[in-house]
Amino acid sequence: GKQVTIGYSENFNTDFGWDHFAEYLEDLFSPGLSVNVAPLVPHGSIRLAVMGYEARPPTKAELEKMKAYVDEAMSAGAAGFSTGLEYSPGQHADKNELIALCSVAASHGGIYASHIRNRADTFMESVVESLNIIRKAGCPGQLSHLAPRPYANEKFDQVLETIYQARDQESLEIGIDTFPDVWAPGPVVTLLPPWVYEDTPDRVLDRLNSPDVVNQCRETFQNPTNYLLRLGGFESFYLTCSKSYPELVGRNFQEISEIFGVDHTETIFKLVLADGSDFYNVMLRHIYATPEDLQQLLLQPICSIESDGVTTAPYGPLKDFVFNRSSYCYTIRFLKEYVIDQKLFTLEEGIRKMTSLPANSARLKGRGQLLEDYAADILIFSLEDLKDNTTDDKPSAYPDGIELVMVNGSIVLEQGTHSQALPGQMLPN
């Protein structure tokens, strides 16, 4: 698992000197941080370390080894266990594997956070699977970015009702969340069939350079059930990050295909191959949900606001990496669009969905409210001056209107200037 990560990140000039979760935390916190971090132990990394990309259930010995890794990480301070079941290698895990691993996290008081298996053809089935894992493991659960795909064939009302029934009738601790945008990020290479990119970077590059693979992939885009076609086709996907073609950022794939003078399939291959071993960081954005479904999800009182972004910065080793606009200004967009403009929420409720609600869902005691004996994590902003400075072709930009940020009682940002203070802590602590 570590070798896969290193291969995809080698151009960040980062030294991965750790082999265990505790060593990772030491590397993360020893230089000091300006923010608090509640790390989750990732199922995908553990499965890769034990089984690679094997598309089968683990043997008893393999499962015990994975359980030991989860136990080790939880003992080191992880806040919980996370899965991404729509993607490899998580998609190869069955319920027995997930319950066993989640139970280890639960024994340490951890939570279970999941990108569920499917939000389209088997949306309800995937939610029920997650509820069963939460139920049998005996831990709180968080179902992430839960809006249905635009082409989902199951009613969202019924999915939400199933979640509320589990909460109300069984007292299961279940939270849900979403980012406040109909657009979602993704690596360009994942438009291709999983067998192309599920491997170490060098092997993936060998496949990407094969004319036979190009032809096989071309056939998949003729299938009307193809994920890309169901989301509107090539004109509905936009490039957001490419080191080799920064001038094309913001253009859709139909336009890029015309500029390259090749068909859609070759366009994808040309984009990902141009960045060599860094191909996984060639990024796109696409429609995540309909405005109606997103609004319905946001209106749920148990729905927290999250970014679905990554840690990045417009300077340093990550300055050229763009995930999507959600890494910056997502809170500003939520307040501007849904609190100020549409008035779907009071300001107080909007802030609750970004503070005490997610803190409680993650079991972060003493966080998320301005109360005596609570940690002084405080943000002061000017409602009138709030401005989202990101755009589709320039998604990395800080907002206006944030006057002060205090973390654990120390000022880390004031009037747009970083104080260089490093008061961040690992949570829960």
Model segments located where?
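Hydrophobic residues within beta-strands of alpha/beta enzymes
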Residues: 81-82, 112, 141, 176, ...
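C-terminal cap of metal-dependent C-N hydrolases
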Residues: 210, 296-303, 308, 312, ...
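Metal-associated gating/positioning segment near the N- to mid-region
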Residues: 1-19
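Divalent metal-coordination and catalytic microenvironments
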Residues: 37, 77, 115, 177, ...
